[in-house]
Design a protein with these regions (language model features):
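Acidic, low-complexity, intrinsically disordered interaction modules
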Residues: 17-49
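Serine-hydrolase catalytic machinery in alpha/beta-hydrolase-like enzymes
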Residues: 59-151
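Gly/Ala-rich beta-loop-alpha elbow adjacent to hydrolase catalytic centers
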Residues: 158-167
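A conserved short beta-strand
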Residues: 176-185
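Short beta-strand/loop motif that positions the catalytic acidic residue
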Residues: 199-201, 205
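Conserved alpha/beta-hydrolase "acid-adjacent" motif
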Residues: 206-212
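Catalytic histidine-centered segment of alpha/beta-hydrolase-like enzymes
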Residues: 230-244
Length: 257
């Protein structure tokens, strides 16, 4: 099987010859691109443009890199997953609930951070947002103060919205090597070290502008999975569509875990 670099090199050459609009058929194994051709080889092939295939491969290359971030962890030591909710998006809501279940299935102990009472109506108010962040980080320090991080082989942070800022700040402050799942991160999240992180963003998220999040994620080399027309909860309002989005998201989460 060709490496990502070899496939990307092939695609760049083909784009020079044929242009980015040329339709190709990509072959996948477990959701990972392994090769491409110009004619369908079977009913399972997927028709996309060369440019789209290039972007897909670049995303997968980053994904493979961050997935290996904790490869040196002691496989025999206990594993811990910590959930950092949003202000209104609690740990019992779909993204955090099902990710926690998947982590538990993979042998992680689960701990959820509680922030206590935080300021309301923080959207668009930088002063209130800063106050909420400071209070939440202070509560996080208290909530996790008894944990001996050195006793765990693998640490997974699962976070949502403002929780993505809290989890990243906490990991940086304590110099922790973690894998991190960032659901609907804020722009402020990307001001922090994010090695070993993947992110999910909805293009209709009123809390974070898509172009900005894409640029910030690219700068930090964070694999960013976009969900079209989805809001800050990665939902569109259509029940069946939202169930499909949740399923697709959890499949990506499971591969990462």
């Amino acid at each position: 099987m060709k490496s990502y670099e070899e496939l990307l090199s092939d695609i760049e050459e083909d784009m020079e010859l044929m242009g980015s609009s040329h339709i190709v058929y990509s072959m996948e194994e477990d959701g990972v691109v392994t090769d491409y051709d110009y004619l369908p080889s079977d009913s399972c092939t997927i028709s996309i443009t060369l440019k789209e295939l290039q972007e897909k491969l670049q995303l997968q290359m980053l994904y493979t890199k961050v997935s290996a971030h904790t490869a040196g962890a002691d496989k025999n030591a206990p594993k811990l997953a910590v959930v950092f909710p949003g202000i209104g998006y609690t740990a019992d809501k779909p993204l955090l609930y099902y990710t926690s279940r998947l982590a538990g299935k993979h042998g992680y102990q689960i701990q959820t951070v509680s922030y206590g009472n935080l300021p309301e109506n923080v959207k668009g108010d930088s002063e209130k947002m800063k106050q909420a962040f400071d209070l939440a980080l202070e509560q996080t320090e208290r909530s996790l103060s008894s944990i001996d991080w050195n006793s765990y082989g693998s640490i997974l942070f699962i976070s949502k919205s403002i929780g993505t800022v809290i989890s990243s700040a906490y990991a940086s402050r304590h110099d922790l090597t973690v894998k991190s799942i960032l659901f609907t991160p804020l722009a402020e999240t990307f001001s922090l070290p994010l090695a070993g992180s993947i992110a999910f963003h909805g293009t209709a998220d009123p809390w974070a502008e898509t172009d900005s999040i894409q640029k910030l994620a690219a700068q930090k080399e964070v694999p960013l999975f976009l969900t079209q027309n989805a809001n800050h909860s990665l939902e569109t309002g259509d029940v069946l569509t939202d169930i499909f989005i949740l399923k697709t998201t959890m499949e990506r989460v499971q591969r990462f875990i």
